[in-house]
């Protein structure tokens, strides 16, 4: 990954990713109390985005299949958004065999990876 690469802020504001929300709330409190400058809080959040993205890229090894009814889809600024109703997730590699999880609705946000955005092939040589 290049030194100037930017990372998406998906995990900060999601109401389902509590660690990002808790981090943002804690940093806001520290800024309000005058314990840290806003610039430091921004650096912490940027590192959080980078670390979480890298962790998901390297650490997730399970395969998941999603079935459901595609309700809405859109493409804006190279970011795809899909809303799927009545999704069924079949997760392989979870314990012995596979596990099925269902829900009422999910939102999937898909972006180009750093390599794809730079025009490189995934898995190719890196500088």
From Swiss-Prot:
Pfam families: TFIIA_gamma_C, TFIIA_gamma_N. GO terms for molecular function: RNA polymerase II core promoter sequence-specific DNA binding; TBP-class protein binding. One of its GO terms (biological process) is RNA polymerase II preinitiation complex assembly. It comes from the Eukaryota. GO terms for cellular component: transcription factor TFIIA complex. It is found in: Nucleus. Keywords: Nucleus, Transcription, Transcription regulation. Belongs to the TFIIA subunit 2 family. TFIIA is a heterodimer composed of the large TOA1 and the small TOA2 subunits. TFIIA is a component of the transcription machinery of RNA polymerase II and plays an important role in transcriptional activation. TFIIA in a complex with tbp mediates transcriptional activity. This is Transcription initiation factor IIA subunit 2. It comes from Cryptococcus neoformans var. neoformans serotype D (strain B-3501A) (Filobasidiella neoformans). The lineage of its organism: Eukaryota, Fungi, Dikarya, Basidiomycota, Agaricomycotina.
């Amino acid at each position: 990954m290049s030194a100037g690469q930017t990372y998406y802020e998906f995990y900060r504001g999601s109401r389902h990713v509590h660690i990002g929300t808790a981090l943002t709330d804690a940093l806001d409190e520290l800024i309000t109390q005058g314990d840290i400058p806003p610039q430091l809080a921004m650096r912490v959040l940027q590192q959080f985005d980078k670390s979480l993205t890298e962790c998901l890229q390297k650490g997730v090894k399970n395969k998941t299949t999603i079935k459901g009814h595609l309700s809405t889809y859109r493409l804006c600024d190279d970011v795809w958004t899909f809303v799927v109703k009545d999704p069924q997730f079949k997760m392989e590699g979870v314990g012995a065999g596979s596990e099925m999880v269902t829900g009422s609705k999910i939102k999937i946000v898909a972006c180009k990876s750093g390599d794809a955005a730079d025009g490189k092939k995934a898995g190719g040589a890196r500088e």
